[in-house]
């Protein structure tokens, strides 16, 4: 292409910010940044701009916030920009075929998994829930299907034994920015071979639901541990304690205690943790949040709370 490439960036949450920054650090200022419309949030229900919008405006970049890219007017406005390439990461709006065909070099997406594993909305948490040892980021050419396009580049990332949804989110966000920065010149020069995704190994990362956060004490303690870690910081694992919702922010699996206590039974509650029997093994709760309270370490949580061995959770 002659002259500087005309790039459009599309993203919305914190996860997309490092990739926008990567474009800027590589010397490319997008001709427009697309992000979702401001959403009402907080106690005052005031419109709140997305993290990508805040970053774009801080850099003096033009921002566009259509409600939908299915709207012919929004498509016409995008076409008027005459983009060479559209970079998409966690945008949250569907790009119809008419939009995918607008940029001269097409649209590419940065996805937080090693495709074809974990296509879909929640690949970070699903990887932890499944007990995967590894994940990563894929740069792929977009098609009409859900995360089905050929992969142009990928970067791998181990999942640590105490990894949470939040910590893995942050590491993958940074990795996506690095991958984009390192491969951008080859991408713009069309030097990245497109590798079709194999059919073997395809699985889908469904959107997280709040009702998945309930801990079923009949399950293996290792599964419960993965649930606690995957759902930190949202929707946060929870159980019932003395008739009230108790959120569990941090826990770890431990050996099963002696005896035949039923799953959900508290067998110890002290400054080292609240140990609860599981279907296999036990779970030691370390950071908890009572209804209406804030997250507390177990020692502080137990101050003034009469939680005794023999009580049942759930």
UniProtKB/Swiss-Prot annotation:
It comes from the Bacteria. CDD domains: FMT_core_Met-tRNA-FMT_N (cd08646), Met_tRNA_FMT_C (cd08704). PROSITE patterns: GART (PS00373). One of its GO terms (cellular component) is cytosol. It catalyses: L-methionyl-tRNA(fMet) + (6R)-10-formyltetrahydrofolate = N-formyl-L-methionyl-tRNA(fMet) + (6S)-5,6,7,8-tetrahydrofolate + H(+). Keywords: Protein biosynthesis, Transferase. Residues 34-69 are annotated as: Disordered. InterPro entries: Fmt, Formyl_trans_C, Formyl_trans_C_sf, Formyl_transf_N, Formyl_transf_N_sf, Formyl_transferase-like_C_sf, GART_AS, Met-tRNA-FMT_C. (6S)-5,6,7,8-tetrahydrofolate binds at residues 113-116. This is Methionyl-tRNA formyltransferase. It comes from Alkalilimnicola ehrlichii (strain ATCC BAA-1101 / DSM 17681 / MLHE-1).
